[in-house]
Amino acid sequence: MKNKGENILTFKDEDNGDQITMYYDIWLTVIREILMKYANKTYAESLKILNKHYYKKPVGYFECIYLSHELEYHWAMIGAYGEGYWLNDGCSELLPTDYYEWYKKFLDENNFNEPFEFYG
């Protein structure tokens, strides 16, 4: 698979040698598309949301692991609706029924890697 952009980040846990690679541009692109598809945001609104602190580039192994432990859908909904978004009327913590199908199709159509790869 092809990746997008120069923002390929690799971090190593110095204690056990585990490594994680993050395709940061792909991660942001997936979140942007989720915001437009599932939160009904415009392209401009999505770009503005991606400027929030949730999406800052990680600078170390544990920051990267933190971002990888939730699906991109979760990060998109936090950006759109805030922490605890699932407690708001009209928002659910449940994934849309077509999410995994849409996600795989989006990555395939754009020839993208998964946003995270784990080694170790």
PLM feature segments, named:
Residues M1-G120:
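C-terminal alpha-helical interaction appendages
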